Amino acid sequence: MQTVAEMIPDYKQNLDALRARRRELIAERELESRFERRHALTVRIIRLDGIIASTTAALHDMIAYAD
């Protein structure tokens, strides 16, 4: 079992990957001409925004706890 301090790098790496995926989806949405596909991409982006926000908050708390 990992300590909180040991988990922080993994959370940071996952957060970077989530942000990169969000950028990819935004770029894909900008090029998409079909409304239905743009809408589906927007829904995915909104879901990712929530995941990114909760992961960021968790990471902040983990860093504070580890100090």
Description of each model-found segment:
Residues M1-A20:
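Short, charge/polar-rich alpha-helical segments
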Residues I8, K12, E30, G50, ...:
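N-terminal regions of proteins, emphasizing targeting and processing segments when present
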Residues D16-V43:
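Short E/K-rich amphipathic alpha-helical oligomerization segments
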Residues R44-D67:
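Amphipathic alpha-helical coiled-coil segments
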